[in-house]
């Protein structure tokens, strides 16, 4: 209770302040891109921060998906700077890909396209560095959700080969998983690890020359 100082930030930039008020309101209009807000409330020596986001519908994003793509990560065999993501999310309205490659602030450039035939969402990532680890997750939006369910769900790729978890990873000893990639600070829920230009696994001759024993 009582007066407090308010500082509202949008994508890390302060857009409105009020040095002393007991009830804070602010209206921002003409929002055309995704915004991550932080409201810092200072009262005496106590600071409370509230976070929330506004996700903009990118509109019609229909485009035929290239052939021979499968659900999950599709690595480009001839260009290690590219990878194509495919997500099957029936009845969802739109999907953004948020990741380390866009500082977890996806714009229209990372709004997934929707294949008109299969209804699957897909997006080609470009500008990747071969051998580097990237993390990402899908922001799946239902514009008219069922009562009691969220309009947006953040989820790792269901076909991930490596997932980082803010809940489980701290309990994994280095002896069990050496050099486990670090979960990205400030994110929510599980994320997928993507790496182009991986060195193919060297199978032993015992495996490649295995002969099935007779019954």
What are these model-predicted stretches?
Residues 8-12, 97-99:
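Conserved aromatic beta-strand anchor motif in extracellular beta-sandwich/beta-rich domains
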Residues 41-43, 140:
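Conserved structural position at the C-terminal beta-strand
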Residues 20-36:
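Solvent-exposed segments in extracellular or luminal domains encompassing
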Residues 46-56, 149-150:
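Edge beta-strands of extracellular beta-sandwich domains
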Residues 57-80, 135-215:
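An acidic, Gly/Ser/Thr/Pro-rich helix-cap/linker signature
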Residues 33-37, 132-136:
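Exposed beta-strand face motif in extracellular beta-rich ectodomains
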Residues 20, 79, 84-131, 141-179:
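Aromatic-rich carbohydrate-binding modules that target alpha-glucans
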Residues 2-6:
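Solvent-exposed loop segments of extracellular immunoglobulin-like
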């Amino acid at each position: 209770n009582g007066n407090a100082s308010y500082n509202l930030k949008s994508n890390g930039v302060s857009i409105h302040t009020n040095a002393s008020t007991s009830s804070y309101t602010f209206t921002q209009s003409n929002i055309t891109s995704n915004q991550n807000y932080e409201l810092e409330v200072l009262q005496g020596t106590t600071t409370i921060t509230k976070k929330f986001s506004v996700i903009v519908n990118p509109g019609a994003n229909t485009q035929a998906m290239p052939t021979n793509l499968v659900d999950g990560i599709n690595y480009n065999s001839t260009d290690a700077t590219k990878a194509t993501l495919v997500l099957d999310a029936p009845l969802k309205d739109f999907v953004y890909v948020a990741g380390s490659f866009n500082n977890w602030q996806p714009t229209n450039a990372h709004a997934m396209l929707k294949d008109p035939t299969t209804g699957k969402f897909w997006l080609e990532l470009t500008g990747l560095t071969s051998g580097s680890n990237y993390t990402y997750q899908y922001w799946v939006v239902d514009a008219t959700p069922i009562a009691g369910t969220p309009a947006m769900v953040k989820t790792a790729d269901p076909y991930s080969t490596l997932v980082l978890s803010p809940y489980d990873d701290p309990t994994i000893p280095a002896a069990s998983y050496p050099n486990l990639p670090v979960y990205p600070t400030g994110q929510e829920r599980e994320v997928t690890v993507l790496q182009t230009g991986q060195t193919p696994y060297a199978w032993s001759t015992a495996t490649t020359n295995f002969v099935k024993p007779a019954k």
